[in-house]
């Protein structure tokens, strides 16, 4: 254990702007094992207020009352963990990150009762899918949507502060909530395998992104990679110290469960590796924590001599060390892990060491008083005498090298397929499910194949967001979700047939596998079933579906005619087409939800849905032609007219030229010939490059960017107006995030 005469060192070297020293009495004692002096933000009150705000939002949104002894980030002794992790943070960004951290603690509490990988995923999965991939029907509960609303709020506020660093925070945050149950419940035979998962699960990769964001620092990928030998050690020390301090609480929780459960801790890894009891394992872990910090200091000294870093890198290293020191102090005195510590109270906002933060406190050795010993004593002295049983069983899997951030595309496809394997997964909607026909197998085959392909889940996320306003009864909303999902996939099947598209979502299109006739028949059958489902919801829902279904077909008719005749529409005609086709499904969802709404029934989202549909498609147009991969230029291969292409063709016509039009006519002839040959009808790389060059010269790409930015502003204005119309509580963070993600 550390000596009271330890030679403490300041973090850095660096200049301090927003932090002050922590009172020395909190760390100059035998309980604090680190060499680094902790500092705390002068704006600790900002962090505390953000955390209380997150608690209130959680209770109001979920209807769940937090337990009286439930503790997150706030600590009236050592200070708020975010003020200790990020003492040099910009106040506005400290507020954002503190809210996010409190959300993580509340989410972590929800996973505490999980005793199987499946139960873990039930709680953990929806947050990850909201930030990334296609959702599941079980994701859309009030509790999950409440957590997603809080995530969306943090994401929007971070992106508005700094889009680049905000995106980095969101990306790394997704890594935390993407850890799967099989990873959380696996047996680890070595500390390396354990740490490999914990660097995701415990948020190590998220912490460094938050440091950059909070302190407004930009490092290149090369600079971050060069620092990995240091950052890996620093974050390993933080994770192991967490395991050391949290062991009593987590072990006690585990022992209370008759059925066992997850108890991911380095203490238990050491117990299994070396056959130690919990006391010896904890002492061994503490020695490892000290050794790792020593190794960090040695490596840092060598790094500073061999590769003298630029000032901004030196500053970043200092921020990491402050994070290490703050993490060490906070765990010692937090009620979350120490039952002798006081509970946070709202009247204690901004307090440190039980009183207001004193910026004049100097680092002077002070011995602990007897009253402090219940809080600042080595955790090993508070261990219970109860022994533990192993936490794994034969059903748990061993560690694999696949990590959440490194999941292969094949693995993603398998997971997507696994969630859409059966008729029941895709079609059954209680209580409005239609009876299974005795001979449905053939007619559903093409549809089930299409629905099993990975998708973005954009429409499900949109309905989650709209339900913030409409509060549709769960059964009705589940039916509407199924209708929209089926209508979307069925329309894609028909589009691929009519456009002769060989690929959909990275796999062969359904008609390539099942033939045109079977695919068309399957899609038509499913659309009929959707009409039946809408009828069961009521006349208003049926009317919504039929009117928007008509618009979808009208929009497709224009697209087919333009492509067949190789005649570009006017830009207003193209916009009208987008509102019919892409906006049609969005409006169908919003109108059906409004028809079944229990609140805000007066709120008409049609204009917003039309704008979102247009924005969604124009961004897709732009990204397809500006992609670095030539193989992505699908619109050119299919002969589809997009805004950049339409703009360039009209400019060419004004100038009396025909080159671009001639290329498109030749491409159309090649596609027609490919229908009776082995040629896939795709444009050559050289032709695609030429078209891209012509679009740039015509100013069509810049024109598209300008249009998208203007449309983005218009969409946000309409969204704000709807929020005002919805009245108190009408702020829709999820819709703001959906809109922001369409920005270019």
Swiss-Prot record:
Positions of dimethylallyl diphosphate binding: 504, 581-582, 617
Residues annotated as binding Mg(2+) 1: 108, 112
Keywords recorded for this protein, A-Z: Isoprene biosynthesis, Lyase, Magnesium, Metal-binding, Multifunctional enzyme, Repeat, Transferase
UniProt-annotated stretches for the region Prenyltransferase: 345-744
Highest rank taxon of the organism: Eukaryota
Binding site for Mg(2+) 2: 108, 112
Basic and acidic residues biased stretches: 409-422
Essential cofactor(s): Mg(2+)
Binding site for isopentenyl diphosphate: 459, 488, 505
Residue numbers binding substrate: 108, 112, 198-201, 246-250, 336-337
Gene Ontology annotations of biological process type: alcohol biosynthetic process; isoprenoid biosynthetic process; mycotoxin biosynthetic process
Gene Ontology terms, MF aspect: geranylgeranyl diphosphate synthase activity; lyase activity; metal ion binding
One Pfam family matching this protein: Terpene_syn_C_2
Transmembrane annotation, as ranges: none
Segments for region (Terpene cyclase): 1-344
Keyword presence, Cytoplasm: no
PANTHER family on file: GERANYLGERANYL PYROPHOSPHATE SYNTHASE
Subunit text: Hexamer.
Family: In the N-terminal section; belongs to the terpene synthase family. In the C-terminal section; belongs to the FPP/GGPP synthase family.
Role this protein plays: Bifunctional terpene synthase involved in the biosynthesis of the diterpenes delta-araneosene and dolasta-1(15),8-diene. The C-terminal prenyltransferase domain of CgDS catalyzes formation of the universal precursor of diterpene, geranylgeranyl diphosphate (GGPP), whereas the N-terminal terpene cyclase domain catalyzes the cyclization of GGPP to the intermediate delta-araneosene that is further converted to dolasta-1(15),8-diene in a second cyclization event. In some cases the cyclization stops at the delta-araneosene stage.
UniProt name for this protein: Dolasta-1(15),8-diene synthase
